[in-house]
Amino acid sequence: MLAAGLVGAAGAVAACSSTKARTGAAPAPTTTKVAVGPTTSTTCSPSAGQLGQIEHVVFVIQENRSFDHYFGTYRGVRGFDDHAANGNGVFAQPIPGAPSGAVLPFHLDTATTNAACTNDITHDWAPQHRAFNNGAMDGWATVHAAVDGADGGVTMGYYTRADLPYYYALADAFTICDAYHCSVIGPTDPNRMFSISATNDPAGLAGGPFINTVDPIPSAKLRFTMGWTTLPERLQNAGVSWKVYDNPAFATLVLAPGISNNKLYYFKRYADPTTELHQRAFGYGFPNDFVKDVQSGTLPSVSWVFASPGIDEHPPASPQRGEAFVSQVVATLLSNPAVWAKTAMFLTYDENGGFFDHVAPLVSPPGTPGEELTVSPLPSDAGGFARPIGLGFRVPMLVVSPFSRGGWVCSDRFDHTSMLRFVETRFGVEVPNLSAWRRSVTGDLTTTLDLSALDLSVPTLPVASDADPVVVRECPAHEVIQTVPHYPIPPNPAMLTQEAGTAKRHSTC
């Protein structure tokens, strides 16, 4: 075990500021319309004693949405105003057949079009690397047109506050991160493996490398076969309480064919149903067990809450059903003030789902240990790409806690391993498998909290319902077995701007 508080405080990239957080990333545009408002609060990496105020850490990881796709129009973030005044830059994506030769981001207007849900588009390892194009970020439209056909254009679609009122209200009330990345330039499974173990076994030493998602999910032939260490095992060995709350249909060993976002199913040490490790990984359901534990004051130190298919936001599942699910998690935490006062909830997305984001992620240099595939030959589905593994594209991250109240924007660079490092910093349980490079370029999420500013006021949040008549009419109940009509690219999308207003940011330490 590590001394609690030492690793994260030393490894944090910066306080939540708009300048330091971009060090080492793609060059900023010559000019930017993103305004930074006056500083009204100061925070640095908290001490171990301060962080001890957090007794419950809750991770909610939804599916397949990029930062620009959800929050590109949100005020003050690095979003759609992040381009030179005299051009559209990377926002104008080359595409054959377009009148101007390029396509701009366009609004998926849920009020007037059938945009409440759109079909799934490719987000596998090879197409994502082609969209990245060595950091040029100019392959989004061409790659998706080639792979996804009539559905490909939706890569450039985005939602606004009118479409996502609950999520925008959470950002207004708490803290949003605009430099949080998924871990892998690829799909669900490798990213979720990083979120629980900080690796996808690129050297193939323990069952990997895992670079794509295997259907059905998790694949029956790969269930309980992976041999590397996960964080829950470390927590178990250290005596730190933890649980996974999953879809009740998957909270048994039987696991009829279907889907779960709980990737602990892949790891061999969880196979024995008589062990506490297995029970904590697969024995608890959402919402019933989660509600019971919160209301009884027995919520463990670390929790993972996984949504079931249809409400996890994986296209064609609707964002609105995801909002309803997340609102249930938040409302449950708020229902017990004693638990809420000691809780930090982190809401993010496993990967971008093929949706456009304009910020080129920082990636490891060639030859970086643990950050490229070293098996030979490469997996057949690698498309010839051995590297980079990551960082991946930006995805949303909302930090919901009485210590994150106030509508802050945090621009420190994070990825999914930052969630593990938050646990490491708070509880002294070392993250397994984390590369030295990734530890050096990402923070541990402690700077998203101001532990000197406990705010127990309950924010006013809109009602989020999974019974919205538009969603019921347009969207399938199960995202995997159904599709929806193609969403066409509008004929003349115009470059948009962000919401008016400035960002509140914590000052640099």
What do these predicted regions represent?
Residues M1-S17:
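N-terminal export signals
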Residues T19-C509:
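N-terminal pro-sequences and low-complexity stem/linker regions of secreted or lumenal proteins
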